[in-house]
Each structure stands twice: as structure tokens, then as C-alpha cells.
Amino acid sequence: MTTNSIRRIVVTAGEPAGIGPDLVLALSKEDWAHQIVVCADKNMLLERAKMLGIDVQLFDYNPEEAPKAQKAGTLIVDHVEIAENAIAGQLNEANGHYVLKTLERAALGCMNDEFDAIVTGPVHKGVINRAGVAFSGHTEFFAEKSNTPLVVMMLATEGLRVALVTTHIPLAYVSKAVTEERLEKIIDILHKDLVEKFAIAEPNIYVCGLNPHAGEDGCLGREEIETITPTLEKIQKEKGIKLIGPLPADTIFNEKYLNDADAVLGMYHDQVLPVLKYKGFGRSVNITLGLPFIRTSVDHGTALELAGTGQADTGSFRTALTHAIELVEKKQ
């Protein structure tokens, strides 16, 4: 961790054929109060900047120098060599390992207190897997690299935070994955980070049921009766965490609940993320809770068709960086 008031945020550019490099280069158009270090191939960034017509000076990253506020028209690059020349819009499996190297470098830097937070650009899971590496997402990757047994995936936009009990698993596996043990661990992490990272003294956590109508008293499924409700009651009794639910997912996003909710906990990926993205797509941020470092990310994919065109929406990426900075500053 940097010791002065100016912090060092590492940014990974993600899939080189996608809009990640475009988003990173867009950061150079304005001043930033903290130092932004881009983990990517320097030549790839220069080529994309030329394609986009962005006038930017790239400086080599020196970890021995004290961090300085970022000036418009500049980027500091921690160079990671790409395997093959990246062509905007054209995936290349040869560069799958390159993407992972940038993520590994960023994670190692955070764990060594060299960086204060990671902001990740979008990656293409298919390319990485076809390169011979089993990869299900940033969240799981950073958990493995930091030896964190369990992390929580949260997405946030203005007026709404959602977190997940299960993440990137097939829907058919969700019911068996929603266990008392997992629920308790997920809620512990969610509550802890809401208190410590978001500075919410006594957070209200609203919890979705798994089944339609939260099981309708067992008529539409018994997971609520047998697992979810007893676990929530146990946690409230033993730990005093404020939990409301399980509530039907089709009504939990009503304003009368959201006005009081500091976070909504969903049982699976597509139960809560469609609502979040409908409410704030392009203005949302992905936050990994439970890691020993701060990590935020965009809420969208690689958008290959927009790479190099100058048409990519920078809203989510800028939100992710701004949110990371806010969380870092709260730690000061």
C-alpha cells in the first residue's frame, strides 16, 4: 500500500481485441487525483491510440518512484508483452495467456501492497479457455490467486447493490449449491464488507428466495423452508445481522424494499443481475467482496464490434475506477 495521500490503482486492459484498450486509453483524456498504472502491452496501446486518434504519452511504470497524480494526455504502463499482434475485433487464442499474465501481475502487486486496488477491463472467457486454461471469470481467478476460499460477487449502480450466493454455475446446479454453510459464509462476507469498505454501520440485507414466490409455502419448492429461512433466522439470532427475507425475487425490487436495502442478496446470477443492468447498464460496477484487496470491474463484455471505432461507452469503466478510488480513500 502506498504511504502518501496519492494512491496507486492498477488497471488491466482485458481482451486486446475488444474495447478494453479503448476504455483504458480514454482515461488519458482527463486528470486523476491518484496514479493510474495500466497493465498491458505498451505497443498494443500505442497502435490502438493511433487507430482512435488519441494523442497520449505512455511512460514506463517504475515501482520505486512515489505515485503522482495522473495528468491528462499521459498513461503509465506496466508492460506485459503480448503473444501476437492484436487486431481490433478479431479474437486470437494465442493471446489468452497474455490476458492472464496481466491479471496475475495486478493481483501480485496488490498482495505485495504495491497497488491499492485493481480495476479490470472486460475479458473473453472463451478465448482463455480455448487457450488451454480453465477460466470462469475474474472473481474466481482472483480468489484462487489470493488463496481466498470464498468471495462474493457484487454489482452496484446508483440506488442498488446486489450480491450473489452462486455465480457462474449452470442453473441446474444452483439448488444443491445453496447450502446453510454457503449462505452463512456469503452473508458474513457481505455484511463485513458493507461495514468496513462501504462504511455502513448496520446494513440492511434483503434476501431473495430461490423459487418462484419464494416457494409459496413449499408448494413451489422447499429450499426456503428447509434451508434458506432457518439459516437466516440462525444468523440473525447468533450474529445480529439484519436480514430481511427470503422474499420473492419478482417483488423484492419494489421501491418500498429498495429504499431500505443496503444490498439485495440473490441466489443465482440471472435472478438479480438483469434488474441491476436494466437499472444501470453502462453506469454499473462489479465489486469482488472478501478479497484481501479492492477489485472493481465493468459490468459488460468485450464488445468486439466496437473495438477501435471510438464508439465504446466508457461509462461503466469510469464508474469502476471512480468506485475503486472511493473505496481506497475510505481506507485512509
From Swiss-Prot:
Its cofactor is Zn(2+); Mg(2+); Co(2+). It catalyses: 4-(phosphooxy)-L-threonine + NAD(+) = 3-amino-2-oxopropyl phosphate + CO2 + NADH. GO terms for cellular component: cytoplasm. InterPro entries: PdxA (IPR037510), PdxA_fam (IPR005255). Keywords: Cobalt, Cytoplasm, Magnesium, Metal-binding, NAD, NADP, Oxidoreductase, Pyridoxine biosynthesis, Zinc. Belongs to the PdxA family. The active site is located at the dimer interface. Catalyzes the NAD(P)-dependent oxidation of 4-(phosphooxy)-L-threonine (HTP) into 2-amino-3-oxo-4-(phosphooxy)butyric acid which spontaneously decarboxylates to form 3-amino-2-oxopropyl phosphate (AHAP). Homodimer. This is 4-hydroxythreonine-4-phosphate dehydrogenase. The gene is pdxA.
